[in-house]
Amino acid sequence: EPLDLIEELNAFFTPKRLQGKRILLTAGPTYEAIDPVRGITNQSSGKMGYALAQACRRAGASVTLVSGPTQLPRPAGVRFIGVQSARQMLDAVTAELDLAASTISIDCFIAVAAVADWRPAQEATQKIKKPSAQPPLIEPHAPVADGPDASAQPGTEGTPAAGVPSIPLVENP
């Protein structure tokens, strides 16, 4: 593909400041299913995380990208792990950090995914009908449980990523 060729040329001519380093990144949104056809997500495109993964790879790093659902092409030369939910992202990141603790260490974990803050307390197995007496409202108290934070949790268990850079959205767009 022409874009892959251009990427390889860019990588070839980029100084290898990260040669020999291992980078773990998260990117994109997460999707918390309400039922088989509805869910809670956000408008994250994943562009920042994918661009960081590409830049680190160009600079010589070995990069693993854990990504929620996006419409972006997978960055060339990057190990890709696709996930949907916040729990899946947390599990994938934890597995990578556990693997790193037992074999080859990760030099940097960059968490830029827009991980869901909430999830339904229980996913319905069938589409919830419109005239339902009690739709599963997403509100702070009722059928909502906190979603796991894939950027906050991994560094809390003495893993190599004890200092985890993450970029939260603190203002409305």
Stretch-by-stretch model annotation:
Residues E1-F13:
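Internal gly/pro-rich beta-alpha loop/helix module
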Residues P2, R57, S62-P173:
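Glycine-rich phosphate/dinucleotide-binding loop and adjoining beta-alpha-beta core of small-molecule
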Residues N10, T26-E32, I40, D107, ...:
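Short, functionally important structural connectors and interaction interfaces within domains
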Residues F12-P15, L97:
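A generic local secondary-structure boundary/capping motif
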Residues R17-S85, I167:
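Glycine-rich phosphate/diphosphate-binding loop of Rossmann-like nucleotide-binding domains
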